[in-house]
Amino acid sequence: MSAYCQVTGRKPSFGKSVSHSHRRTNRRWNPNIQRRTFYLPSEGRSITLNVSTKGLKTIDRDGIESVVAKIRARGEKI
């Protein structure tokens, strides 16, 4: 899935667009996904993650090592 955050698990949300005449059509709101490369000092290599902007704040707060450990605990391969 392209619009999926590997850190927070955010996915597109769905809803309706409502026009001036109140006609409703389906639409989706995509999360703000950024493809970022992070260096893991413990492994001596870089990894590339698809992360939302909220996921970037999580990495800044908790550190890349602990975030990668949580992703691997969920069973995702990095």
From Swiss-Prot:
Residues 1-26 are annotated as: Disordered. One of its GO terms (biological process) is translation. HAMAP family: Ribosomal_bL28. It holds the Pfam family Ribosomal_L28. GO terms for molecular function: structural constituent of ribosome. This is Large ribosomal subunit protein bL28. Belongs to the bacterial ribosomal protein bL28 family. GO terms for cellular component: ribonucleoprotein complex; ribosome. It comes from the Bacteria.
